[in-house]
Amino acid sequence: MRTISVYLLFMLLTIGITNAQISSAQKVLVSVTDDWNSNTATLYLFDKTGDGWKKHRSVFSVSIGRNGLGWGEGVHPHQSGEYVKTEGDNRSPAGMFELDTLLYGLGEKAPDGVQIPYLPLTKLTRCVDDENSSVYNSIVEEDSLKKDWHSAERMGYVDPDYKYVLVVKNNPLRQPGKGSCIFIHTVNVPTSGCTSMDDEDMLALLRWLDPKKKTVLVQLPLDEYHRLRSEWNLPKLLNN
């Protein structure tokens, strides 16, 4: 009985944390796929209003990991099962994740109309995907610290995919093997785990973001979205 009580308390606490994250968010991106193995998705944007969530007029067709989705490590309760994201599995993370409202890009300055802070990528910018590194799942400048990794993305050379890059906070505790370097970026083709879209759609997304408003990404197969919508207090998808 004590074990059951502790488990129920844990579940209530984790659900409460998830609800707090979505409750404190003022903007949410919802990316839904047909199933776990689909590598395309539909992306909806929602703004919080006094009457609840209001869907933005734009709906985007996007690409995700070429092998589909796997449960990631975000602000949602821990999930297990057949589909769990690991390093190098070519799956995008499923769940709820904070979105870092800092834009990286290949140009010298942000596009017109973008409010969030901008940081140009350099030829030394790396995202470390070596799980044995002390800076695993981190973006660093290679000349700013002692190199202890054997594998990293050379972000300043990834053109045109990294023309614009937003960081999805998957695996923020940087647990080895749980996945690294998950972004939203340009070029709408299936990826190694990121969410990608056409330039025009990416610009619309970037101009919609507000640095003063907390933003989260919810990324799930459609059936899972419907299953969790009430529990996680998610917006209703009017077209589904």
Where are these regions (language model features)?
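Cell wall/extracellular polymer interaction/catalysis modules
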Residues: 21-192, 202-240
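Bacterial Sec-dependent N-terminal signal peptides
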Residues: 1-21
